[in-house]
Amino acid sequence: MAAAVGRLLRASVARHVSAIPWGISATAALRPAACGRTSLTNLLCSGSSQAKLFSTSSSCHAPAVTQHAPYFKGTAVVNGEFKDLSLDDFKGKYLVLFFYPLDFTFVCPTEIVAFSDKANEFHDVNCEVVAVSVDSHFSHLAWINTPRKNGGLGHMNIALLSDLTKQISRDYGVLLEGSGLALRGLFIIDPNGVIKHLSVNDLPVGRSVEETLRLVKAFQYVETHGEVCPANWTPDSPTIKPSPAASKEYFQKVNQ
């Protein structure tokens, strides 16, 4: 893996940095130190070929909240078997589509296992979860067949989708073009195929499954009740009627 990541930093940068471990962000790995290593900020501002290695796929074409999610189709591992999977398979359901950098890494299995362990709670609210990386479906299966105590995934209750061509990651605006890896992008897509939420993390930090589930429930509540959800809303907390007069009911209740 060190060799693969090292290809991110070709030419002069490669003389200073031999690898970026997956527990460290690209920004941290290139932070100026006493030895005078070049900072990532300088690389990005220089317009050099090295800087382009860290650019993502064209942000001007990246999907946005309220827009329809880009169509995708590929081979996934579902219940230990290979299966064709597309966005059309989730019509009428909510979908959490989350991207991760690579199989057999460090933060990634913690996220995937956490989502898998909560799969039934997502199913209870008519929501499916799909994880995506640029690995092959064969790699996904090998990782699933690796015990968790050895960094593997074990039995999975969610689908792992292969994006070997990198087109899905590119279409969703999370592909790091130089390395060919995807950032930790997460998209909540409603039953009509519309993006309700998106977030993108740098490589070293995993995401909250509980927060993702809370957001799905919040969007569903708004659709069902026509009221809006305040900060830190949970299903047992009050909501707001979206009008100047009616909203006072909420503010009076929480500011007693």
UniProtKB/Swiss-Prot annotation:
Q: Which reaction does it catalyse?
A: a hydroperoxide + [thioredoxin]-dithiol = an alcohol + [thioredoxin]-disulfide + H2O
- A Pfam family of the record is AhpC-TSA
Transit peptide stretch: 1-61
Q: Does the keyword Cytoplasm apply?
A: yes
Q: Which residues carry this modification: N6-acetyllysine?
A: 91
The Enzyme Commission number assigned here is: 1.11.1.24
N6-succinyllysine-modified residues are: 83, 91
Phosphothreonine: which positions carry it? 146
One GO MF term on file is: identical protein binding
Taking every annotated instance into account, which residue ranges of this chain make up the domain Thioredoxin? Answer: 63-221
Report the GO terms under cellular component. Answer: cytoplasm; cytosol; early endosome; intracellular membrane-bounded organelle; mitochondrial matrix; mitochondrion; nucleoplasm; plasma membrane
What's in the keyword line of the UniProt record? Acetylation, Antioxidant, Corneal dystrophy, Cytoplasm, Disease variant, Disulfide bond, Endosome, Lipoprotein, Mitochondrion, Neurodegeneration, Oxidoreductase, Palmitate, Peroxidase, Phosphoprotein, Redox-active center, Transit peptide
Q: What family does the database annotate?
A: Belongs to the peroxiredoxin family. AhpC/Prx1 subfamily.
Summarize the subunit comment: Homodimer; disulfide-linked, upon oxidation. 6 homodimers assemble to form a ring-like dodecamer. Interacts with NEK6. Interacts with LRRK2. Interacts with MAP3K13. Interacts with RPS6KC1 (via PX domain).
Name the linked condition.
Spinocerebellar ataxia, autosomal recessive, 32: A form of spinocerebellar ataxia, a clinically and genetically heterogeneous group of cerebellar disorders due to degeneration of the cerebellum with variable involvement of the brainstem and spinal cord. SCAR32 is characterized by the onset of gait ataxia in the second or third decades of life. Other classic features include upper limb ataxia, oculomotor signs, dysphagia, and dysarthria. Some patients may have hyper- or hypokinetic movement abnormalities. Brain imaging shows cerebellar atrophy.
Q: What protein name does the entry list?
A: Thioredoxin-dependent peroxide reductase, mitochondrial
Which species does this protein come from?
Homo sapiens
